[in-house]
Amino acid sequence: MEFKLIAEYFDRLEKISSRIQLTALLTDLLKKSDKDVIDKVIYITQGKLWPDFFEKPEIGLGEKLMIKALSVSTNIKEDEIEKQLRILGDLGEVAYKLKRTNSSQNVLSYLGSTKVTKLTVEEVYESLSKIALSEGEGSRDMKIRSLAGLLKKADPLEAKYIIRFIDGRLRVGIGDATIMDALANVFGGGTAARPLIERAYNLRADLGNIAKLLAENGIETIKSIKPEVGIPIRPMLAERLTDPSEILAKVGGKGIVDYKYDGERAQIHKKGEKVYIFSRRLENITRQYPDVVEYIKNSIKSNEVILEGEIVAIDKESGEILPFQNLMHRKRKNDIGEAIKEYPVNVYLFDLMYNDGEDYTQKPLPDRREKLEEIVTQNDIVKVADHKYIDKVNELVEYFHQAISDGTEGVIVKSIGKDSIYQAGARGFLWIKLKKDYQSEMADSVDLVIVGAFYGRGKRGGKLSSLLMAAYDPDKDTFYTVCKVASGFSDAELEEVQKMLSEAKLDKKDPRVESEIQPDIWVKPKYVAEIIGAEITLSPLHTCCKGVVSEEAGLSIRFPRFIRWRDDKSVEEATTPNEILEMYQSRLKKKVEDITET
């Protein structure tokens, strides 16, 4: 399969703003893709070489090295390439322009004076993989040579998207939900097959692998997909409510209440002596927790198991729970040993998805919890999360206050009914979180995605200091604007914002974004921030839930304030419009009750 086909479709996708048209065009591309490389077509469309959970590096080629490779491949001086980059602002466009005007290649090609070797998808993928995996002495020069060789063979459009892929800026506006829609069209005959594909993806978070299974064996093959040790399951997500009575009613009048720890949610896989730890974003973070690996080996009786829990930083003197930020020291590669000593952790396990050949995701929570307690040998480090069975509102309220006093964020109330399965990748009312924020009228913070930014004035003049934030609707694969946030940033965080936005800047709005506001720059949806504010309110400027509460207005946050970056969350895990609507309706209900009481 020629890489040119992908480049041509990417060029067409970039010009489209309708999700329906995006899905139709991607469907067409997948129909034309050879089944032996369809997994690679999916990965490239996702902007990656392999799933995040693979223990493999990213490409790791900076702008300067790409410019050097482009210079080698075109015989054009680096200074001239840098000049063109300042003019065009997109190295992919620079590559396209230079390849078109590079007469030494194009004249011969068009006159047929030389045989033109066409790039294949396999060749491009293998070359980029080689670049990513190269390390050690001489790897820098090898990467430049490999990329230069690839660009030399590429035509202008291919070069544009090879550079953009490496740069992390494909700009085709395709999310995982759209890919699943297209796969359903190609291999399942339409939307009826979509739930099957999504369930397979939730249990095996590798769309490339799923596409290959579909291409080789058809839709029936994915019906039998089960959890597999070493391949992460997409995490189940909780809804949020603020009224304990409503929460208990939602879960059927009784449930389990778990502490909500302020730590790193972790999915832990064990197979014999091998242990893998994955983040909620499904990234392999085993390297950060070698101590946890040993704890799990010594605490879990099962041979093959997939568990879920929270890794929490602990004060080494008092044993008290420390804030999540203390775990950031674990991300540094060079001093893990020191971080283990200074920032010890506890592991609080709260769910079981797979155990010695048996899929537990379809079992109700009481069965999962019973088996979890059976296979865990609890000690000072590895424990089953603090929890309580409740069937009265006052029990929930008392346990909530106990959780807060013990240094947690609050509680999660979980259904224990027959339908209380582990809903991988889904957000629903089987789990409901109840959190307390002491600094705001909003009952809870929200996690929103940056989709645009505005330049500041006065002291912040010339800097992008106000961020356009959006909620994510997974059913529509669409981001809806909620607020502009400009407060809460330290000077250091504001400098970090400049770097982040320069790397994510787009020439035009991402097709998945619905906005009636025109920011100074559009941003690729990739960064999630935790935001708090005074209250959820109506706004004619924002698109979140527009037409739901009011025909003229959407929902927004009054006096929004930045709290922290949520690096542990993907954009698809951001707060949904439905959650914001629930928060708005709960606030209205409370106001009515307050008025009635007076």
UniProtKB/Swiss-Prot annotation:
GO molecular function, one term: ATP binding
Group of enzyme by EC: ligase
Cited Gene3D superfamilies: DNA ligase, ATP-dependent, N-terminal domain (1.10.3260.10), DNA ligase/mRNA capping enzyme (3.30.470.30), Nucleic acid-binding proteins (2.40.50.140)
Coiled coil (UniProt feature): none
Transmembrane segments: none
Active site location: K260
One of the GO BP terms on file: DNA biosynthetic process
Enzyme Commission identifier(s): 6.5.1.1
Keyword Endoplasmic reticulum carried by entry: no
Alphabetized PROSITE patterns for the sequence: DNA_LIGASE_A1, DNA_LIGASE_A2, DNA_LIGASE_A3
Binding site for ATP: D258, R265, R280, E310, F350, R427, K433
Pfam families reported for this sequence: DNA_ligase_A_C (PF04679), DNA_ligase_A_M (PF01068), DNA_ligase_A_N (PF04675)
Reaction equations catalysed: ATP + (deoxyribonucleotide)n-3'-hydroxyl + 5'-phospho-(deoxyribonucleotide)m = (deoxyribonucleotide)n+m + AMP + diphosphate
Cofactor requirements of the protein: Mg(2+)
Keywords in alphabetical order: ATP-binding, Cell cycle, Cell division, DNA damage, DNA recombination, DNA repair, DNA replication, Ligase, Magnesium, Metal-binding, Nucleotide-binding
InterPro entries: ATP-dep_DNA_ligase, DNA_ligae_ATP-dep_bac/arc, DNA_ligase_ATP-dep, DNA_ligase_ATP-dep_C, DNA_ligase_ATP-dep_cent, DNA_ligase_ATP-dep_CS, DNA_ligase_ATP-dep_N, DNA_ligase_N_sf
Top-level taxonomic group: Archaea
CDD domains (UniProt xref): Adenylation_DNA_ligase_Arch_LigB (cd07901), OBF_DNA_ligase_I (cd07969)
Stated role: DNA ligase that seals nicks in double-stranded DNA during DNA replication, DNA recombination and DNA repair.
Family: Belongs to the ATP-dependent DNA ligase family.
PANTHER family per record: DNA LIGASE 1 (PTHR45674:SF4), DNA LIGASE 1/3 FAMILY MEMBER (PTHR45674)
Family annotation (HAMAP family): DNA_ligase
Protein name stated in the entry: DNA ligase
Origin species: Sulfolobus acidocaldarius (strain ATCC 33909 / DSM 639 / JCM 8929 / NBRC 15157 / NCIMB 11770)
